[in-house]
Regions:
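C-terminal tail/cap regions
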Residues: 1-19, 227, 256-311
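Alpha-helical packing segments of well-folded alpha/beta enzyme cores
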Residues: 81, 110, 183, 245-249, ...
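Short, positively charged
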Residues: 17, 22, 53, 236-238
Length: 311
């Protein structure tokens, strides 16, 4: 009874209202509408762009007149997203390419097809394997969608090879997001100097990681109905919509404020933030990178060995 009385204390109502207003005001410190950047003549690739944050980010890039390529696993859902974005933006230069990131054969096929058909890439959201095209198109940006949950992740190289496994699905997610940040920092180090062929050395290929915040996306469909209902009720006040969740992605992809910045982590309010100590450890980053190269069959320069290439 004492607990029930405490929960129904009259101060809970105003405190909850104040907290809700504060959280609502902090949903994003930056709005896409405040950034007038036009991407005409630029090519952008967004993976997982048939729904959620990816689709919202692709829509914003297309709205800015970029040639926007949606890299999706499902042809049907990807085609529907392409048509929706074309109608919403009036930009006919929106296209679908099939990419299943769980299949290295699909990733390699996507990369080869892109290099043959496009050749130039200026914005890459959460993708890999087309770095050469980005170097030739500098200044270019790579945007990796991580999460604030990287703070509790584990940087265990054995997770990559399957020799060991995280304790549960939640820990696996957190560890994956930690590796996103580690790879971002390591890739930024390896891309240093890519701007030397341009007028400004700082305008080469940059790469940054970000957190979209807590977003109500289609990932919730995998949970039971009561969990979905709870998230829906809580989400009215506390969760971001996919559009709001895409703000930090769009910010890192197009904002002039991010020009020349690389190897950094941005929070869901589009502000530079300090990632976890593990995420800032260069030795761990190099170890994870080297282990990943071996697993996907790349050489030390990040290229596929000639013996593996298909004519």
């Amino acid at each position: 009874m004492e607990l029930l009385a405490l929960c129904w204390h009259p101060l809970w109502v105003p405190c909850t209202l104040v907290l809700s207003v504060v959280l609502w005001a902090r949903r994003a410190a930056w709005r896409p509408a405040a950034c007038p950047v036009d991407l005409r003549g630029k090519t952008a690739v967004v993976t997982g762009a048939n729904s959620g944050i990816g689709k919202c980010a692709a829509l914003e890039l297309a709205r800015r007149n970029a040639r926007t390529i949606l890299a999706c696993r499902s042809r049907e859902r990807g085609a529907a997203a392409v048509e929706e974005i074309r109608r919403a933006t009036g930009n006919p230069d929106v296209h679908l390419r099939i990419l299943d990131t769980s299949s290295m054969a699909s990733v390699r096929n996507f990369a080869r097809q892109f290099l043959e058909e496009e050749g130039r890439l200026h914005i890459l959201v959460n993708n890999a394997g087309t770095t050469d095209a980005m170097k030739a198109s500098a200044p270019s940006r790579i945007v990796n969608v991580s999460s604030f949950r990287h703070q509790t992740g584990e940087a265990n190289v054995q997770f990559l090879s399957g020799k060991e496994y995280p304790k549960n699905v939640s820990k696996a997610y957190d560890s994956t997001k930690l590796m996103n940040v580690l790879f971002t920092v390591e890739l930024a180090r390896r891309l240093q100097g890519t701007g030397q062929r341009t007028a400004l050395p700082s305008r080469g290929v940059t790469v940054n990681a970000l957190s979209p915040g807590i977003v109500h996306t289609e990932i919730m469909k995998n949970y039971s109905w009561w969990v979905r209902l709870l998230f829906h009720l809580v989400g009215i006040l506390f969760l971001k919509s996919p559009t709001q969740g895409s703000f930090s992605t769009t910010y890192c992809a197009v904002s002039e404020e991010v020009e020349g910045i690389s190897g950094k982590y941005f929070d869901s309010d589009c502000r530079l933030a300090l990632p976890s100590p593990l995420a800032r450890d260069p030795a761990i980053g190099r170890k994870l990178w080297e282990a990943s190269e071996k697993l996907v069959g790349l050489d030390d320069g990040g290229r596929e060995p000639a013996s593996r290439k298909v004519a």
